[in-house]
């Protein structure tokens, strides 16, 4: 688990049972003396704990709306966004910095933390305005901080405490009986308090911790105390006042907070107990004595009784609590029965031993309550419980519980690295929970989880740590107990079978297996039931739940003879109708088959049936095979188990183990077309003694046995871990072996099988990369909708008033029209790819509204409000740059306030002047109207004004609202507010007032919404005869309309007014102050306030119809426009280059072919002859003579690098090459992005498609062909005019998947083509496949990993795959049986290959081989028989030599070393016959033989020539050869082809060569050259300079092929020629002449 971690939550004063002797502090001690001792021993307050508590208090504080105030101070403003902040604040600090200092424990004093918080809040007050939320939050939090700090850091005076306590004593000593009841009530309040989830808060405070388990507790805490002690003191009458008990409660809480870490549960519980006690104390002090005494009854005593007794007696205190409860109820029933006092209960309990205390501590630490111990749900005789309890209660020699660190998992907060290393964490608490839920069926399953827990601890901790040693000890104990239980189980099983008695164990096993089968069927059924369609979420099983109706589908029951549905299957599962799982699967398949048979192919039901059957198969495959039923075994089998020593192998496998096993088996069991198992040679590594150079070349050897052992030991946390080991094994084989070898090919094929298997198992689980384009468009859409639907308190949308803004600003007539409606269409058509462009368009509309309207108008205020709201929602959606980093975020609310204030300063003087002129004009118009009305007639001079008048039995007053007859008959009556009433000289009554307009009487846009029954106060006033009044109505102000209603008026006659309407400007403005005359109507409150409902305009329907009418033509005209993305306005940004070339104009940002490019961008470049275009990065760009160019590094794809085919690459990985080029911009195909590994996981540029985003973490060096990681690409600092990319950050980093090398498939095809034309080996390969059983039974001793490669390598040699003892016998037996079949294909190939080569001179070797093979297959049988007859005429190959090499020349009948070598006068395939030159294998009689026996390992043949041995097993060797020591190494030198190069570079002339030839002649030497020196030369001993390499005869070979350099290819040619020389000598029996 972790020796690295400390206990996250320590026990307070009570984690364990009470083995502590309470005598020294539970005796009756007088209050004052005890208090003095406490003062002397008072533990100091931990400043770090106080600092943590203060920080948490500030962090968790919320205001009235539930918002965390600390969010405003989590991070200081960014310098880029708010540079003026750093002009005001010299020492910036934020909560993140304070938290970091807390974690690093830099605060050793509370005053240091106080200084930092003061600096934080002072900075906020200095920068923000007093009315801002930040300023107010800073003030609130600072007050909270000081208040909390004063609570923690108290400076009490001992003398004052003494005086207080004496005062309390004097007041309370007079009534000791009543005091005891009060104290019991306080104790009860503390003891029974629970948290919201029902957990008992006081549980850990009832008993002191064990001295054995927590000795440090008593070293830190000088005055331990628990609730049991407090209860005893209450019963003993130790407390003389409430204050004395309060002191002990404070001490209890302080002890817990001193010992435990801040933030732990115990720390919080201590504060809660103190708070509960104080609240109860205050309640009692303010209550009446009588009521208090009535409340104090037996429950308090019962609570004290529980606390005074030990927490665990026997097997727990459950029974004790029950007994005490019974006594309580029994005493309550008796009328005059004595109460069960707490002290009586205290005497009933004895003290615990340290053993019980430690166990109780462990039980509580694990989170088990006494009433819920493991024995309550499991029999102690159960083997599962016994194994678990043995591990859990394991102790060391000192009696300490060594399993304690494994009770709970480490804290994720403190040990995040634990959860990174350990993929499947598990603890004893989780194992206990699984035991409780009966999830373990066998001991093996429980053992698997315990082993997983131990392996996790061993994996995380170092071997010499204490935890690691504990793990080893516990594993030994567990294994010993497991063997004991298994042995006991076997004996019991055997006895029970003999006696034919049914044991409980056997019945439980049968029952559990039956339950397991039923559970599996339920899982499979639920998998089908819960399957849903990926796109729509539709349940696929809906049409399969019940059979079709016979009434609706009568033909169904004629076609389908056996109907089946899911309801019937579920019924059968519930009632145990199915004998096994197969029966249920058969019914499922029948149901799907019926659906496919009845419905047409391609229909929804048909497709659903297919999909559900696939899901069912996958789920069944995931569950794995059914466990075998051991219960049906015969008695003999049962008895035989007793003699078995090894325990049963576990049949229980986790889903991950099943996947790992499936991958391993797929690689192990793969066979080729001939049935040959390719993995046989990879099972085991060669020994160091046989092949030491293998371990020099390969640094990390691995074989399949090692992989299997890791898999069995659960060392693989996931499939990728196993795949890495397999890839390393195949890479080792490819590194050591030659590229043309069969082993090399087998490694590549198995590598491909491995990747395909993993893809099948994981379902090609490539990490899902979010679609950034859709996310940006969704963000913009959400932002637009939020802004457009933003409403005020009355439910009015602010955007309604802005809909009336003209699309074109008169000040800028050339600008394209832009309105919210246009923006909405752009958003719906997903034309925005950048947030800053969307923000520019929105702000342009809002700023136009501000420019064109007065500062006191409704439109202006709404525009400002919407702009503020836009910024707020934008920052929330982008999380201030944590989700989306955009230049748009640089415009903040502060910038908006500055712009608005500046605008108001410019406009206010003009508006004041306009108001003044308007008032003068209105005054003149009023005077004119009075003059005109005065001159109209004498009647106006004789007006009689009054406050009311009557008409048609109705009385009208000033302030009343009336309906007035309309001017036209088809119109609604006008609404007028009466302001004046008079009667003229003619006796006619008149009224004068303000007209109110209905919405249809105003000019407005169809998008505007109105309140129901809304009217508008107009600027139109006029007089009307009273005779035209049609009736009364009421117009109410909006603030009263929803709450009040007028008396004696119908609802139809009541209207609401919120705004005034100006007929001149055709605009609306909210009414802030209702100034209409007071009405005589009486208003009463509404029973239920009216809801605020807004309705669409009457013009909306007609406008919508017109819009639909023209929508088709609009769509046709703008179909292209909707597809095109909107681009942000950019400009060419020139830059001065100090070292630039003359005539070149350099740019940081440039537009080329409608494509905007900037320095640092990556682009696709035209690349001729490559599969994919290369990627270049622009580091400079310039224009010269009208042509544009750029310069920068080039990135290459994996297929352009040299690497082993087994290498894995990330998808879309590129490599930075050494090549830096200057390219014309005409070769640019498009833009792309190349990200570092870290950025590739976390973010994406928003304007680049995911297909064009690449990953680069390595640089490829062309000279040494190496890939090395580098820090990162060069970054550029560009001017402000350059438009930065917007970056979207993922909420969760993606996990990039790797893919095989692009060379893998090509290399496999090449090698298959090469080996395909070697038809002579077909039958031998089949024989090898037949003999493979021996190979798999005993893992092979790998052979040569550098086999010689040519057409002769059709039957490589594999040594006997058994122990050294059996080598001799098997060699003789198999060697006598084995015959080497020489096929006529070899002779046919030697004749046909030159012909095909002449016809197709450009074909490669592999292509020629395929054509030769095709010709051979198409050849008539008679022709084939002729070739077979010709080849049979050649002498057979003799068995390989068993003797030493000496004297080999004298053996006249020597045969070729390798079977299948061409016979005399037979041309090897592909080599045309040349007249005058003998074919290979034919040497003149005058050639001298070359004899020599080099020492083992001296020279290349020790590792490169096949070793003679029994040819019985011919598996291809991927690993170095392993031969018995008795077998000789056959070597035969040949005429040297190369001489070691001179140490210095020299010019070799013909004359110099001739002189050296003369010097080399010697009478003592039988040969002209020093062939023995040449034979001993090795590749690794010869180092050539570049000049020497350039002078090599590279023209001998067409190309270097699969070799790294031309020198390697020539060395390979030399080895082949030497081998051919040896074979020729042996095949043709060449003797000394």
Curated annotation (Swiss-Prot):
Biased composition (Basic and acidic residues): 900-931
Residues in the DNA-binding region annotation: 1378-1446
Domain BAH: residue ranges: 954-1072, 1155-1271
Gene Ontology molecular function: any one: chromatin binding
Keyword Secreted: no
Keywords for this protein: Bromodomain, Chromatin regulator, DNA-binding, Nucleus, Repeat, Transcription, Transcription regulation
Compositional bias of kind Acidic residues: 158-167, 1320-1335
CDD domains: BAH_polybromo, Bromo_polybromo_I, Bromo_polybromo_II, Bromo_polybromo_III, Bromo_polybromo_IV, Bromo_polybromo_V, Bromo_polybromo_VI, HMG-box_PB1
Region (Disordered) location: 1-40, 155-174, 300-333, 484-517, 623-644, 900-940, 1319-1377, 1509-1531
InterPro entries: BAH_dom (IPR001025), BAH_sf (IPR043151), Bromodomain (IPR001487), Bromodomain-like_sf (IPR036427), Bromodomain_CS (IPR018359), HMG_box_dom (IPR009071), HMG_box_dom_sf (IPR036910), PBRM1_BD5 (IPR037968)
Keyword flag Nucleus: yes
Record's compositionally biased regions (Basic residues): 508-517
Single GO BP term: transcription elongation by RNA polymerase II
A cellular component term, taken from the record's GO annotations: SWI/SNF complex
Subcellular location: Nucleus
Boundaries of every Bromo domain copy: 42-152, 174-284, 379-485, 512-623, 651-761, 767-877
Biased composition (Polar residues): 300-315, 497-506, 1337-1349
Main localization category: nucleus
Assembly notes: Component of the SWI/SNF-B (PBAF) chromatin-remodeling complex.
Physiological role: Involved in transcriptional activation and repression of select genes by chromatin remodeling (alteration of DNA-nucleosome topology).
Record's protein name: Protein polybromo-1
Naturally occurring in which organism (per UniProt): Gallus gallus
Lineage: Eukaryota, Metazoa, Chordata, Craniata, Vertebrata
Designated gene of the protein: PBRM1
């Amino acid at each position: 688990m972790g020796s690295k971690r400390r206990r996250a939550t320590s026990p307070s004063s009570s984690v364990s049972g009470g083995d502590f002797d309470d005598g020294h502090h539970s005796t009756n001690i007088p209050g004052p003396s005890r208090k003095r001792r406490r003062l002397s021993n008072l533990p100091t307050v931990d400043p770090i704990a106080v600092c943590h508590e203060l920080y948490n208090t500030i962090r968790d504080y919320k205001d009235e709306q539930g918002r965390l105030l600390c969010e405003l101070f989590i991070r200081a403003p960014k310098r880029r966004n708010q540079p003026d902040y750093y002009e005001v604040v010299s020492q910036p600090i934020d909560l993140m910095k304070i938290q970091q200092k807390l974690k690093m424990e830099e605060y050793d004093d509370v005053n240091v933390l106080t200084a930092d918080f003061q600096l934080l809040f002072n900075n906020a007050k200095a920068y923000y305005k007093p009315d801002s939320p930040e300023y107010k939050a800073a003030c609130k939090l600072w007050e909270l901080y000081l208040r909390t700090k004063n609570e923690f850091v108290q400076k009490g005076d001992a003398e004052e405490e003494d005086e207080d306590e004496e005062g309390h004593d004097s007041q309370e000593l007079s009534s000791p009986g009543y005091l005891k009841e009060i104290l019991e009530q306080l104790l009860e309040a503390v003891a029974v308090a629970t948290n919201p989830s029902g957990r008992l808060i006081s549980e850990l405070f009832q008993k002191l911790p064990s001295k054995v388990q927590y000795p440090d507790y008593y070293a830190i805490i000088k005055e331990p105390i628990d609730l049991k002690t407090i209860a005893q003191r209450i019963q003993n009458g130790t407390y003389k006042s409430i204050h004395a008990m309060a002191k002990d409660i404070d001490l209890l809480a302080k002890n817990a907070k001193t010992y435990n870490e801040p933030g732990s549960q115990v720390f919080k519980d201590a504060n809660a107990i103190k708070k509960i006690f104080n609240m109860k104390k205050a309640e009692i002090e303010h209550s009446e004595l009588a009521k208090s005494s009535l409340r104090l009854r037996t429950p308090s005593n019962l609570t004290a009784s529980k606390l005074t007794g030990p927490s665990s007696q026997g097997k727990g205190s459950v029974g004790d609590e029950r007994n005490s409860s019974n006594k309580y109820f029994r005493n309550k029933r008796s009328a005059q029965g004595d109460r069960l006092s707490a002290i009586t209960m205290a005497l009933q309990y004895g003290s615990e031993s340290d053993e019980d205390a430690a166990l109780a501590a462990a039980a509580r630490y694990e989170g088990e309550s006494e009433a819920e111990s493991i024995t309550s749900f499991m029999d102690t005789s159960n083997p599962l419980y016994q194994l678990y309890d043995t591990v859990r209660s394991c102790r060391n020699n000192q009696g300490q519980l060594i399993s304690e660190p494994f009770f709970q998992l480490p804290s994720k907060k403190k040990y995040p690295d634990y959860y990174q290393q350990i993929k499947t964490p598990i603890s004893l608490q989780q194992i206990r929970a699984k035991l409780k839920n009966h999830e373990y069926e066998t001991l093996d399953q429980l053992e698997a989880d315990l082993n997983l827990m131990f392996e996790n601890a061993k994996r995380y901790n170092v071997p010499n740590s204490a935890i690691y040693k504990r793990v080893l000890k516990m594993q030994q104990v567990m294994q010993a107990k497991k063997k004991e239980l298994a042995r006991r189980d076997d004996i019991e099983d055997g006895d029970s079978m003999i006696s034919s008695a049914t044991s409980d164990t056997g019945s439980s096993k049968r029952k559990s297996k039956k339950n397991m089968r039923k559970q599996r069927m339920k899982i499979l059924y639920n998998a089908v039931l819960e399957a849903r369609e990926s796109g729509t979420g539709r349940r696929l099983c809906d049409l399969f739940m019940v059979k079709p109706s016979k009434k609706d589908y009568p033909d169904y029951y004629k076609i389908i003879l056996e109907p089946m549905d899911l309801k019937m299957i579920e019924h059968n599962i519930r009632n145990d109708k199915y004998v096994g799982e197969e029966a249920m699967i058969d019914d499922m398949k029948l149901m799907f088959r019926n659906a496919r048979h009845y419905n047409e192919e391609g229909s929804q039901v048909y497709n659903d049936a297919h999909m559900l059957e696939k899901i069912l198969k996958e789920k069944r495959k995931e569950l794995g095979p059914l466990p075998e039923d051991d219960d049906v075994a015969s008695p003999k089998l049962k008895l035989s188990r007793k003699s078995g020593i090894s325990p049963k192998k576990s049949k229980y496998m986790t889903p991950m183990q099943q996947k790992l096993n499936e991958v391993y088996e797929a690689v192990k069991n793969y066979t080729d077309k001939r049935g040959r198992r390719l993995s046989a040679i990879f099972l085991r590594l060669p020994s160091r003694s046989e092949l030491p150079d293998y371990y020099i070349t390969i640094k990390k050897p691995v074989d399949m046995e090692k992989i299997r052992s890791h898999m069995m030991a659960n060392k693989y946390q996931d499939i990728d871990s196993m795949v890495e080991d397999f890839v390393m094994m195949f890479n080792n084989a490819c590194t050591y072996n030659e590229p043309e070898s069969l082993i090399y090919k087998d490694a590549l094929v198995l590598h491909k099988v491995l990747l395909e298997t993993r893809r099948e198992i994981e379902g090609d689980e490539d990490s899902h990369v979010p679609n950034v384009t859709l996310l940006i468009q969704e963000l913009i859409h959400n932002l637009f909708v939020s802004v457009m639907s933003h409403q005020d308190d009355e439910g009015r949308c602010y955007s309604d008033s802005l809909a009336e803004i003209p699309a074109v600003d008169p000040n800028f007539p050339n600008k394209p029209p832009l309105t919210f409606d246009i923006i909405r269409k752009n958003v719906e058509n997903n034309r925005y790819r950048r947030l800053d462009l969307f923000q520019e368009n929105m702000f342009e509309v809002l700023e136009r509204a501000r420019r064109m309207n007065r500062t006191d108008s409704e439109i202006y205020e709404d525009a400002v409000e919407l702009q503020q709201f836009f910024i707020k929602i934008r920052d929330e959606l982008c999380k201030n740059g944590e989700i989306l980093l955009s230049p748009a975020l640089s415009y903040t609310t502060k910038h908006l306030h500055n712009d608005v204030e500046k605008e108001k300063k410019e406009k206010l003087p003009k508006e004041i002047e306009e108001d003044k002129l308007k008032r003068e004009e209105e005054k003149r118009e009023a005077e004119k109207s009075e003059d005109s009305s005065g001159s109209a007639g004498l009647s106006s001079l004789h007006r009689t004004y009054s406050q009311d008048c009557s008409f048609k039995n109705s009385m009208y007053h000033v302030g009343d609202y009336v309906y007035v007859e309309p001017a036209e008959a088809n119109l609604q009556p006008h609404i007028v507010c009466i302001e004046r009433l008079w009667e003229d000289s003619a006796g006619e009554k008149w009224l004068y007032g303000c007209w109110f307009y209905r919405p249809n009487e105003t000019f407005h846009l169809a998008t505007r919404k109105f309140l129901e029954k809304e009217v508008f106060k107009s600027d139109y006033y006029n007089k009307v005869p009273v005779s035209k009044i049609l009736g009364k109505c009421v117009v109410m102000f909006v603030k009263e309309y929803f709450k009040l209603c007028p008396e004696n008026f119908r609802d139809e006659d009541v209207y609401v007014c919120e705004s005034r309407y100006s007929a001149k400007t055709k605009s609306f403005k909210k009414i802030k102050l209702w100034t209409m005359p007071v009405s005589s109507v009486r208003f009463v409150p509404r029973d239920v306030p009216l809801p605020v409902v807004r309705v669409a305009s009457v013009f909306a329907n007609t406008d919508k119809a017109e819009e639909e009418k023209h929508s088709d033509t609009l769509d046709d005209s703008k179909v292209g426009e909707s597809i095109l993305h909107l681009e942000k306005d950019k400009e060419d940004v020139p830059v001065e280059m100090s070292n630039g070339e003359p005539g070149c104009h350099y740019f940081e940002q440039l537009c080329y072919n409608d494509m905007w490019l900037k320095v640092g961008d990556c682009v696709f470049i035209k690349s001729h002859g490559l599969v994919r275009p290369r990627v270049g990065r622009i580091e400079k760009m310039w224009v010269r003579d009208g042509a544009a160019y750029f310069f920068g590094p080039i990135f290459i794809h994996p297929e352009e690098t040299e690497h082993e085919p087994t290498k894995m690459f990330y998808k879309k990985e590129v490599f930075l090459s050494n090549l830096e080029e200057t390219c014309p911009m005409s070769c640019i195909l498009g833009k792309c992005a190349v990200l570092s590994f870290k950025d590739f996981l976390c973010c994406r540029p928003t304007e680049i498609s995911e297909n064009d985003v690449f990953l680069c973490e390595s640089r490829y060096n062309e000279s040494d062909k190496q890939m090395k990681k580098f820090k990162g690409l060069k970054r550029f600092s560009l001017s402000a005019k350059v438009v930065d990319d917007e970056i979207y950050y993922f909420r969760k980093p993606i996990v990039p998947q790797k893919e095989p090398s692009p060379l893998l498939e090509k290399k496999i095809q090449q090698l298959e083509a090469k080996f395909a034309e070697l038809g002579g080996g077909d039958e031998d390969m089949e024989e090898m496949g037949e003999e493979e059983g021996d190979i798999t039974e005993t893992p092979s001793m790998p052979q040569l990993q550098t086999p010689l490669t040519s057409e002769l390598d059709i039957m490589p040699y594999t040594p006997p795959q058994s122990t050294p003892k059996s080598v001799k016998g098997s060699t003789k037996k198999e060697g006598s049986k084995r015959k080497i079949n020489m096929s006529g294909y070899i002779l046919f190939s030697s004749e046909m290959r030159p012909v095909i080569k002449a016809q197709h001179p450009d074909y490669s070797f592999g292509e020629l081989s395929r054509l030769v093979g095709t010709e051979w297959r198409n050849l008539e049988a008679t022709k084939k028989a002729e070739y077979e007859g010709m080849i049979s005429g050649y002498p057979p190959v003799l068995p390989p030599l068993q003797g030493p090499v000496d004297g080999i020349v004298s053996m006249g009948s020597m045969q070729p070393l390798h079977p299948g070598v061409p016979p005399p006068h037979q041309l090897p395939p592909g080599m045309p016959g040349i007249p005058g030159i003998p074919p290979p294998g034919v040497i003149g009689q005058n050639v001298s033989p070359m004899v020599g026996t080099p020492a083992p390992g001296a020279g290349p043949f020790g590792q490169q020539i096949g070793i003679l041995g029994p040819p019985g097993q011919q598996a291809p060797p991927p690993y170095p050869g392993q031969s018995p020591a008795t077998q000789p190494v056959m070597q035969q030198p040949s005429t040297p082809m190369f001489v070691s190069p001179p140490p210095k570079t020299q010019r070799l002339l013909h004359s110099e060569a001739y002189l050296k030839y003369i010097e080399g002649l010697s009478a003592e030497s039988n040969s002209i050259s020093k062939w023995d020196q040449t034979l001993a030369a090795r590749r690794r001993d010869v180092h050539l300079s570049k000049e020497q390499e350039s002078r090599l005869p590279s023209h001998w070979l067409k190309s270097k092929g699969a070799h790294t350099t031309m020198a390697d290819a020539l060395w390979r040619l030399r080895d082949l020629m030497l081998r051919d020389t040896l074979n020729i000598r042996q095949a043709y029996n060449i003797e000394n002449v």
